[in-house]
């Protein structure tokens, strides 16, 4: 940890203060000049800067300089494997629809990924996440070029950066039965490996691509290799092609099919859910299945706008926000999520409350179905995942309006300090414990090699 603080309870004390403190606790406490006391991996106390400095006079003090102190962001759905696609020009790539995007871009990319590509992608993506104030990442990985050991590569990258992460590998029939089985075993191996850790920093799920690339037999094989307490991370109805495939092959909607095979449940996370009907929403609600929306990605892929307001308000489905690999800055999903539903529904009142609830309340609640330490809140015994944002604003910030300040005034690039699990991972915009320039350099070198291979 950067700096040496006051030892108490077997750990070193750290204070982060002199800033407007957003706690997100049950009472929504907000301190104009607030401070967080960190003891080891958890929050010990929150209060005013004056009272906590008096209580812990020898603790290391990080000065927020009037900025905003708040819980770290959680990204509930990411695709780190897409990192090297930034700036990539693919030969013979002229997509006309989402299936073209999948087949001619993403499946082509993941077939070219090596273990080293995965590792370097992981390091730079986790680094970028930390720089954007993201302290927990749920990732959905694919690298059909080299499957076995790929989640270990991401795990190693996360450990080196000190970020909290939940990993899975997307099982699919698209490259044949042998690779499908290898993908299942990659999930099973990492589920076992993560269960042996006691640091609450890495968890695992059984990953699945989507219903239209998985037979019933493949889904059953996934289920047979998934222990109790572990759920599935799967894309549902991201495109109409998925819907039509299920109706044509199985005579039932996607969610009904997954329900019949026992895939839904409180530990399962469904990405997108754009083209689903009322009965499917009922099944998601009744099984407690989590849904993650990714508004920026949905617009970019031209796949439509999910009925998120209806799922949230009418059906009470637990819904969160992700980036789907589009960016590592979760505030972008907040901003786009706010406007896409207003535009889609032609309703200027839509999404004002729902989207911030997804980001600040539901993302932590969903993440805590896997991680034991309470996330997304600054209160005693919660995870010491804290960020400082260099934001001051032209108008007063209060407990009633700070979500509007975040929405209209903040972005990930304003984050100056990131603390994860009580460890300072970024201080004054410098990521700690690694050679940041080397990480960027190694990633760019590896990306150039990857670009040549993917275009061969």
Regions picked out by a protein language model, each given a short descriptive name:
Residues 19, 36, 41, 66, ...:
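Divalent metal-coordination and catalytic microenvironments
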Residues 84-118, 175-176, 240-267, 287-290, ...:
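Active-site gating loops and adjacent loop-to-helix segments of metal-dependent hydrolytic enzymes
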């Amino acid at each position: 940890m950067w700096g040496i603080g006051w030892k108490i309870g077997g750990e070193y004390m750290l204070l982060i203060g002199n800033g407007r403190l957003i706690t997100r606790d049950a009472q929504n406490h907000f301190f104009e000049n607030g401070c967080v006391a960190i003891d080891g991996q958890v929050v010990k106390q929150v209060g005013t800067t004056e009272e906590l400095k008096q209580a812990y006079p020898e603790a290391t003090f990080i000065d927020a300089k009037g900025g905003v102190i708040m819980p770290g962001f959680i990204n509930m759905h990411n695709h780190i494997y897409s990192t090297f696609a930034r700036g990539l020009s693919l030969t013979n790539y002229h997509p006309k629809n989402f299936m073209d995007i999948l087949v001619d871009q993403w499946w082509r990319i993941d077939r070219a990924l090596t273990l080293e590509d995965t590792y370097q992608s992981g390091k730079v993506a986790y680094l970028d996440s930390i720089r954007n104030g993201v302290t927990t990442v749920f990732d959905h990985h694919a690298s059909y070029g080299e499957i076995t050991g790929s989640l270990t590569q991401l795990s190693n990258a996360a450990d080196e950066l000190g970020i909290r992460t939940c990993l899975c590998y997307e099982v699919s029939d698209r490259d044949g039965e042998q690779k499908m089985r290898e993908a299942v075993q990659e999930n099973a191996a990492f589920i076992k490996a993560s269960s042996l850790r006691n640091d609450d920093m890495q968890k695992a799920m059984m990953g699945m691509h989507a219903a239209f690339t998985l037979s019933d037999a493949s889904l059953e094989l996934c289920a047979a290799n998934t222990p109790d307490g572990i759920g599935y991370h799967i894309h549902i109805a991201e495109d109409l092609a998925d819907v039509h495939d299920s109706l044509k092959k199985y005579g039932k909607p996607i969610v009904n099919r997954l329900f019949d095979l026992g895939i839904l449940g409180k530990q399962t996370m469904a990405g997108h859910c754009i083209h689903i009907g009322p009965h499917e929403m009922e099944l998601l609600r009744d099984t407690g299945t989590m849904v993650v929306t990714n508004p920026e990605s949905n617009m970019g892929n031209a796949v439509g706008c999910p009925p998120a307001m209806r799922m949230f308000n009418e059906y009470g489905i637990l819904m969160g926000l992700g980036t789907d690999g589009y960016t590592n800055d979760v505030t972008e999903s907040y901003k786009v999520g706010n406007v896409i539903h207003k535009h889609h529904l032609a309703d200027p009142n839509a999404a004002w409350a729902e989207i911030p609830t997804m980001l600040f309340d539901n993302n932590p609640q969903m993440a805590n179905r896997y991680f034991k330490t309470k996330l997304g809140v600054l209160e005693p015994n919660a995870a010491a995942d804290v960020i400082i944002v260099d934001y001051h604003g032209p108008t007063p910030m209060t407990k009633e309006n700070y979500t509007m300040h975040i929405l209209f005034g903040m972005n990930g690039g304003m984050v100056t300090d990131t603390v994860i699990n009580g460890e300072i991972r970024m201080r004054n915009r410098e990521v700690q414990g690694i050679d940041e320039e080397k990480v960027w350099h190694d990633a760019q070198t590896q990306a150039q090699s990857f670009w040549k291979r993917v275009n061969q």
